[in-house]
Amino acid sequence: MVNTKVTLCGVEIDNPIIPASGTYGFGYEFAELYDINILGSLSFKGTTLNPRFGNPTPRIAECPEGMLNAVGLQNPGVDLVKSREIPKLREVFNKPMMANVSGFSEYEYVTTVERLDSEADIGWFEVNISCPNVHGGGMSFGTSPESAEAITRAVRRVTKKPLIIKLSPNVTDIVSIAKACEAGGADGVSLINTLMGMRIDLKKRKPILANKTGGYSGPAILPVAVRMVYQVYDAVKIPIVGMGGVSTAEDVIEFMLAGATAVEVGAANLVNPYACRDIINDLPVVMEKYGIKNLSEIIGGAH
């Protein structure tokens, strides 16, 4: 009998599998397909202070081994998320949920977290300082250690819930930014967000995406993500949520050996809506294959 339980920032979860924000809606949509309570947790759709309609179309471009997206944080805004979306999720999900939050100023980040903080079902905040697909100041918080630490401190002051900062790979040194978030009071970091990319339509001789650039995700980015998780694990003492190209139980084990406590599944959900269920079902089989009895014991095992 294998043990898939892990403890993320003081909260025990049944397994390390968490659908990544932006690929799983608000979660309840997937409850029509399978019992989502098999998940470790879920990170619901990125939430901003005000409603956002997102970027103009086309927003998606298929690529070999992945996809580009420039959705632009489309969401109904924090007030509707709180009054409409979370209650719908609560009806079908009885575990702590992860609230993914983004913003374009310190005020927006802080106010959004403040408004969600009273929700008892939120087990963690995942603060996205790295989304590359919006116009405005959101990206700047994740591109320097100073700004990353400042936004972490600001949000830390308004919540006692575990605070996980989501990091961008589109930086010179992700390790220094992770350390800055830790210094600012983060309880954990999640990485990586998407890699900035572009595709060009050969007939039109124009970028395919209306936004021109977008975030590249899918299996091709996994080696980059594993490398960054490995590097960050050596530099910080807080837990890491790893993500980037995960589509199999073997990928989950690889991320955990690199240093991840939990693992988010993103683009795979868009290709196969049963991806998280399949990975969770396969995990004990893969653990047996590699002689793993307790998942929590392999965290950082490749170091």
Q: Residues of each region from the PLM?
A:
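Glycine-rich beta-to-alpha transition loops that act as phosphate-gripper elements at the mouths
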Residues: 24, 100-103, 167-173, 222, ...
